[in-house]
Amino acid sequence: MPPTSGTSRSVALVTLGCARNDVDSEELAGRLADAGWTLVDDADGADVAVVNTCGFVEQAKKDSIDTVLAAADLKEAGRTKAVVAVGCMAERYGKDLAESLPEADAILGFDSYGDLSSHLEAILHGEKPQSHVPRDRRTLLPLAPAERQAARPVIAEPDLPEGLAPASGPRVVRRRLGSGPWAPVKIAAGCDRRCTFCAIPAFRGSFVSRPAEEVLAETRWLAEQGVKEVFLVSENTTSYGKDLGDLRALEALLPHVAAVEGIERVRVSYLQPAEVRPGLLDALTSTPGVVPYFDLSFQHSSPAVLRRMRRFGGTEPFLALLEQVRERHPQAGIRSNVIVGFPGETEADVDELCSFLERARLDVVGVFGYSDEDGTEAETLDGKLPDEVVAARVDRVTRLVEELVTQRAEERLGEVVEVLVESVVDEDGDPHVVGRAAHQGPDVDGETELDLPAGFVVHVGDLVTARVTGVAGADLLAEPLVRATV
């Protein structure tokens, strides 16, 4: 419902965590704007600051708490009247978080998203909403994937003007909070895997795909907003379609997304190695408009460690998968994350991981030290390693990864790349132009700086063909070969 105070209320959404959280924030922004709220960029200029928290790892939780506390300080110093925590940490800890974080005026879970406006309005009128009570969200949908589409929650939205529905397709309830040339599109939510270290399925729920028409409608809307690259995200993208009756639904979806007018690049995130199939490899390396980018979640390469993680694979199967990727597209971008110091991990396991990384030639590797996550199976495992051992192993693998990432970047010297321009800043009369090549995902995979010749003009959103001339870690320096395309 719209604000009832007679004057416009303002709200700022502060987002932490992954691209999936970015989508959630923009969907919340769309609902709040529909309800009459004014969206502002900075919390210190808003009546209400909504902090979309991340609960992935310990550092992310600390960052979320610090952000809530910083927003709460604004209540004493500025116009901000209320601070509300939402997102994964709020969903996961609920009332316990509320008790330990009284500075927040409310802790609201995912079920509050559909009527967030009413909750915020009530808070501004002095009411105290009941704090979210966590529950295992895997219990909210049928066990059988095929039965989930009929049971998935659908929030009723305000009617569209006559004539716009249903021919126009599903309504997009989203408001962009940034103006960059790329945007994430959530194609599914939840996860059915049972990795022992991961709490995400418990608070994100069972895996549910979004129907293709919803994904395409949102992609078309983003293209109308000037977006050139869409980043398809979920907790496990390779499972897309399992609840739609088609395990090859992702392969079928990709060409339709890439065909949306105005979209120049389609990127797919978070591929589960055990679920990657030949047809998907073909689609990701040969579909026009889809970049050959593989975000493969290896986590480790020692079969013994992977078994304790309840994951599949090992050094040789993973290397075979990488060979299949490069047989199809030698320049494909490949990134991964690994967990070091998992319970029961031996020095021999770390040696095997390091050997795998040396042979894998990955563009980017994120290295995480294991720490217990509340409520996970790994929390109960024996063989826990001392903190100093975990830290030493993280340091060892991180130093190796830094060398290997630089080596992989150096292999790209002389390579011709397509760079999506994301930033053009004038520095004393000379443009400083930064973007991403096809093998570089947003935010975490490095960037490419363009060394422009005199008179070469580019704008944000342009695709520039360039040749790689230098490297700095995962970052590249490249010189344009042809005029930019708009």
Swiss-Prot record:
It comes from the Bacteria. [4Fe-4S] cluster 1 binds at residues 18, 54, 88. Binds 2 [4Fe-4S] clusters. One cluster is coordinated with 3 cysteines and an exchangeable S-adenosyl-L-methionine. GO terms for molecular function: 4 iron, 4 sulfur cluster binding; aspartic acid methylthiotransferase activity; metal ion binding; protein methylthiotransferase activity. It catalyses: L-aspartate(89)-[ribosomal protein uS12]-hydrogen + (sulfur carrier)-SH + AH2 + 2 S-adenosyl-L-methionine = 3-methylsulfanyl-L-aspartate(89)-[ribosomal protein uS12]-hydrogen + (sulfur carrier)-H + 5'-deoxyadenosine + L-methionine + A + S-adenosyl-L-homocysteine + 2 H(+). This is Ribosomal protein uS12 methylthiotransferase RimO. Belongs to the methylthiotransferase family. RimO subfamily. It comes from Kineococcus radiotolerans (strain ATCC BAA-149 / DSM 14245 / SRS30216). The keyword Cytoplasm applies.
